Swiss-Prot record:
SMART domains found in the cross-reference section: AAI
Function: Plant non-specific lipid-transfer proteins transfer phospholipids as well as galactolipids across membranes. May play a role in wax or cutin deposition in the cell walls of expanding epidermal cells and certain secretory tissues.
Keyword Disulfide bond: yes
Record keywords: Allergen, Disulfide bond, Lipid-binding, Signal, Transport
Name of the featured protein: Probable non-specific lipid-transfer protein 2
Source organism (scientific name): Parietaria judaica
Pfam families, sorted: Tryp_alpha_amyl
Family in the record: Belongs to the plant LTP family.
PROSITE patterns per UniProt: PLANT_LTP (PS00597)
Amino acid sequence: MRTVSMAALVVIAAALAWTSSAELASAPAPGEGPCGKVVHHIMPCLKFVKGEEKEPSKSCCSGTKKLSEEVKTTEQKREACKCIVAATKGISGIKNELVAEVPKKCGITTTLPPITADFDCSKIESTIFRGYY
């Protein structure tokens, strides 16, 4: 069984939340609402996970790493997960195989479970996400 860094899951899954520049423009600024910081860090990953760029941008990787440093406790991870799940409902166009590539391409050691809009955030435990691989 593989284990998953929830911080990396949070970062990558949050990138799924926005599918157009109009949606990005309406995303909360850092500090606005519970998802503002998550959104701020992962917005640069959108083009890569949609297949519009061949590699994640430097800002995608730096945001991913920064968020993984900030989301530490089980409760923080669960709250970030809830934000992501709410934001991803009804979103299409995300390529899950590219989502799984972001940690590797950004130098973050992790694997990712399937990411869906009905993901059960209560499964998140401490520093490890278990049971999906």
